[in-house]
Amino acid sequence: MSTVPLTLDEIFDLARKTLLANGCDDETASILSDLIRNAERDGSLSHGLFRLPAYVSGLKSGKINGKGKPEIKKISSSVIKVQGNNCLAPVVLNKGLPELAKAAKENGVAVLAINNSHHMAAMWPDTEKLAEEGLVAFACTSYKPAVAPAGAIKPLFGTNPISFAWPRPGKTPVVYDMATASMAMGEVQVAKREGHKVPLGTGLTKDGKETTDPGAIADGGVLLPFGGYKGSAIAMMVELMACLLYTSDAADEYDR
């Protein structure tokens, strides 16, 4: 496999031109391209250019609205909901985060929920932005089933990632972003593409057997939670907070 080195600016330009050519307006293309560039900068290959073909596929199929405009609805002074109108989640968050920060500063605490959007992408850029404004930030999201609970062999939870950021005046914030699965599915897919094995305990084959083959996990297999039953419990917490608290479907209802 051959590779072509690109600067961060070249990555941004490539992503933006590709998205514009496939149905995105300028605002959407710029938001997504900035996220892709930052993911590549921070070494998160599964959220960088690797994601571009999936975005293009979603745009071409009509599943993703590349020109949609999210709509804000304030449920209370400290609870904000954004209707995504089938935009990609980073576009929806870009609309809601300023309102969230304002509400948190005015009330001491605030919550932002988004729905009818696609692919949350990396969450740390957004929690980091909030921490840079002096706010403590926590984010989580659910998705379609890909992770078997501890002791099971069939998927029930999404990879259900969480991100946390803590402000440090005059210094960079403390930030983390992690899947509650043993590994993000995107990282498994990257390992498959590059021909790498994954650690034992990452996932199971479609027959429920342990494997180090990322292809056997990504193609019909299942991921495992990190930390056994502890990771399962945190994945369940995310499911309840990110979905059912805001009347969205749970992961096991994704295809219903």
What are the roles of these predicted feature ranges?
Residues 2-4, 8-22:
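Generic N-terminal amphipathic, Lys/Arg-enriched alpha-helix
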Residues 20-23, 42-46:
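N-terminal and secondary-structure boundary signal
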Residues 26-37:
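Short, well-structured alpha-helical segments
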Residues 50-97:
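Active-site cofactor/substrate anionic-group-binding motifs, chiefly glycine-
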Residues 81-169:
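A generic, well-ordered mixed alpha/beta core segment in the N-terminal half of proteins
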Residues 147-215:
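Phosphate/diphosphate-binding glycine-rich loops and adjacent basic-rich segments that engage nucleotide
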Residues 196-245:
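Secondary-shell segments that build the walls of catalytic and ion/ligand-binding clefts
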Residues 246-256:
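Single conserved hydrophobic/aromatic residue that forms the stacking wall/gate
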